[in-house]
A protein has these predicted regions:
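Hydrophobic/aromatic residues located in beta-strands of well-ordered beta-sheets
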Residues: 98-100, 162, 186
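Buried, small/hydrophobic-residue-enriched core segments of structured protein domains
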Residues: 1-4, 8-158, 168-174, 178-179, ...
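Short hydrophobic "strand-cap" motifs at the C-terminus of beta-strands
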Residues: 165
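Gly/Ser/Thr/Ala-enriched C-terminal appendages of enzymes
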Residues: 150-155, 160, 168-251
Length: 251
């Protein structure tokens, strides 16, 4: 299995025109140790890093990662809340690589602007001795990456890297490259950690309530938007028990 993953991972790395590819598949792997050894196989195949900290600890390979949408939402579903999240993250991880997730609400109208503002407030610029950048996780990645690059350069952040994730595989990466995307590094999860023959269940964690207060993740991709507040799942059936269920509704 490890050798097969190496072959697939190497294919993904090569199709990304030699840009760094990081393994982000732990949450979708078929068990905790599958995640650990799958990440190891990805590193052997040529991935630049893995989000699996245990793999990095056991095998001495580089671990990498950013932040979750739930982290951003936990500071409040407002533009200022996003800024507070970025500021807290930078202050906590100062002296390390800093990658800010900018698509929790709106990539160009607030996420990127908050990232630039927070970088500058904390003295993060092209003289920062570690890596710094922003991550895109939804929307038209090719278009957004071009626009983000223009705005970053206009603000003097020429060394700020653009990372991209969102169910990527070697084919999507190749397509992004053909479109002229200004992406510096790709994060690949499902396509590395699982196979087409035994794929993953495409569920994700979204924060909907914190300390009794509803929170909501906005997105330019409507499929990624959620209802705020505590919810229950209702199973609807026309002819129970003959017909076990027809649809599940969360509200």
């Amino acid at each position: 299995v490890g050798s097969e993953m190496c072959i697939r991972d190497r294919s993904g790395v090569c199709r990304a025109t030699n840009k760094p590819v990081s393994e982000f598949g732990s949450r979708r792997a078929h068990g905790p140790w599958a995640a650990v050894y799958g990440a190891k196989a990805a590193i052997i195949a040529g991935c630049a890093g893995t989000s699996n900290i245990l793999t990095g600890s056991i095998f001495g390979c580089g671990s990498t990662g950013t932040m979750a949408h739930s982290f951003v939402s936990s500071f409040g579903c407002t533009v200022e809340g996003e800024h507070k999240a970025f500021d807290a993250y930078i202050k906590t991880h100062l002296g390390e690589n800093l990658i800010l997730l900018i698509d929790t609400y709106n990539t160009l109208k607030c996420g990127l602007l908050n990232a630039i503002r927070t970088f500058k407030e904390n003295g993060i610029d092209d003289d920062y001795p570690y890596g710094y950048g922003v991550r895109l996780d939804s929307g038209d990645l090719a278009y957004l990456s071009v626009e983000v690059r223009i705005i970053l350069d206009e603000n003097g952040l020429h060394n700020c890297k653009i990372f991209a994730t969102n169910s990527l595989d070697e084919y999507l990466i190749s397509d992004l490259e053909r479109q002229g995307a200004r992406i510096d590094c790709y994060g690949v999860g499902d396509a590395i950690a699982t196979s087409k023959a035994a794929p993953c269940f495409g569920n994700v964690y979204k924060l909907v309530q914190l300390d009794g207060k509803p929170v909501m993740k906005m997105s330019e991709d409507r499929a990624k938007m959620i209802n705020p507040g505590f919810q229950r799942t209702w199973r609807i059936s026309k002819n129970y028990p003959e017909e076990l269920f027809k649809i599940d509704v969360t509200c």
